[in-house]
């Protein structure tokens, strides 16, 4: 059985993220979506909210599990006995950062491979940052996120903490 980890902040989970999960879940026996705590990124949604959102969006995939984590990715990968780290590449601008991360992960986890997936064409430009900015400014994000995620965004914007 080959398990993979797809780590990210998922702030919020977008249709682009789900596209990668769908495709990766067809490749691996088990896919663990690791929702990173990422306090340095100052996420819009709390870790618990991001986990709940991801579970709502991805709950229908029988071989996909969503878990939160903090600390080093290498520890999360080991905990889940994963052999592959899945990463998305939207554009050339993502490549340099992801290439460096893959190199560091190879150093820390020599027996774990990093696999890059590019999103389907209609999702190439979507990012959680863009989605949040559009939503906060009152724009329509329905083409970028699922209805449940749009509701989460609207509720969070209406009741900021």
UniProtKB/Swiss-Prot annotation:
<keyword id="KW-0548">Nucleotidyltransferase</keyword>
<feature type="site" description="Transition state stabilizer">
    <location>
        <position position="17"/>
    </location>
</feature>
<dbReference type="InterPro" id="IPR004821">
    <property type="entry name" value="Cyt_trans-like"/>
</dbReference>
<dbReference type="GO" id="GO:0004595">
    <property type="term" value="F:pantetheine-phosphate adenylyltransferase activity"/>
</dbReference>
<keyword id="KW-0808">Transferase</keyword>
<feature type="binding site">
    <location>
        <position position="9"/>
    </location>
    <ligand>
        <name>substrate</name>
    </ligand>
</feature>
<keyword id="KW-0460">Magnesium</keyword>
<feature type="binding site">
    <location>
        <begin position="9"/>
        <end position="10"/>
    </location>
    <ligand>
        <name>ATP</name>
    </ligand>
</feature>
<dbReference type="InterPro" id="IPR001980">
    <property type="entry name" value="PPAT"/>
</dbReference>
<feature type="binding site">
    <location>
        <position position="41"/>
    </location>
    <ligand>
        <name>substrate</name>
    </ligand>
</feature>
<comment type="pathway">
    <text>Cofactor biosynthesis; coenzyme A biosynthesis; CoA from (R)-pantothenate: step 4/5.</text>
</comment>
<keyword id="KW-0067">ATP-binding</keyword>
<feature type="binding site">
    <location>
        <position position="73"/>
    </location>
    <ligand>
        <name>substrate</name>
    </ligand>
</feature>
<comment type="similarity">
    <text>Belongs to the bacterial CoaD family.</text>
</comment>
<protein>
    <recommendedName>
        <fullName>Phosphopantetheine adenylyltransferase</fullName>
        <ecNumber>2.7.7.3</ecNumber>
    </recommendedName>
</protein>
<comment type="subunit">
    <text>Homohexamer.</text>
</comment>
<dbReference type="GO" id="GO:0015937">
    <property type="term" value="P:coenzyme A biosynthetic process"/>
</dbReference>
<keyword id="KW-0173">Coenzyme A biosynthesis</keyword>
<feature type="binding site">
    <location>
        <position position="98"/>
    </location>
    <ligand>
        <name>ATP</name>
    </ligand>
</feature>
<dbReference type="InterPro" id="IPR014729">
    <property type="entry name" value="Rossmann-like_a/b/a_fold"/>
</dbReference>
<keyword id="KW-0547">Nucleotide-binding</keyword>
<comment type="function">
    <text>Reversibly transfers an adenylyl group from ATP to 4'-phosphopantetheine, yielding dephospho-CoA (dPCoA) and pyrophosphate.</text>
</comment>
<feature type="binding site">
    <location>
        <position position="87"/>
    </location>
    <ligand>
        <name>substrate</name>
    </ligand>
</feature>
<feature type="binding site">
    <location>
        <begin position="88"/>
        <end position="90"/>
    </location>
    <ligand>
        <name>ATP</name>
    </ligand>
</feature>
<feature type="binding site">
    <location>
        <position position="17"/>
    </location>
    <ligand>
        <name>ATP</name>
    </ligand>
</feature>
<dbReference type="GO" id="GO:0005524">
    <property type="term" value="F:ATP binding"/>
</dbReference>
<dbReference type="GO" id="GO:0005737">
    <property type="term" value="C:cytoplasm"/>
</dbReference>
<dbReference type="Pfam" id="PF01467">
    <property type="entry name" value="CTP_transf_like"/>
</dbReference>
<feature type="binding site">
    <location>
        <begin position="123"/>
        <end position="129"/>
    </location>
    <ligand>
        <name>ATP</name>
    </ligand>
</feature>
<keyword id="KW-0963">Cytoplasm</keyword>
């Amino acid at each position: 059985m080959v398990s993979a980890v797809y780590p990210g902040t998922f702030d919020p989970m977008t249709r682009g993220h789900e596209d990668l999960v769908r495709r990766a879940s067809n490749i691996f026996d088990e896919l663990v979506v690791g929702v990173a705590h990422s306090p340095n990124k100052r996420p819009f949604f709390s870790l618990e909210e991001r986990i709940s959102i991801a579970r709502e969006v991805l709950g229908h995939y029988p071989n996909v599990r969503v878990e939160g984590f903090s600390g080093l990715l290498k520890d999360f990968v080991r905990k889940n006995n994963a052999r592959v780290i899945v990463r998305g590449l939207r554009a050339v601008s993502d490549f340099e950062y992801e290439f460096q991360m893959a190199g560091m992960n190879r150093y820390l986890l020599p027996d774990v491979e990093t696999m890059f997936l590019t999103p389907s064409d209609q999702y190439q430009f979507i990012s959680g940052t863009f989605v949040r900015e559009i939503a906060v400014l009152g724009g329509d994000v329905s083409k970028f996120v699922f209805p449940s995620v749009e509701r989460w965004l609207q509720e969070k914007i209406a009741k900021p903490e």
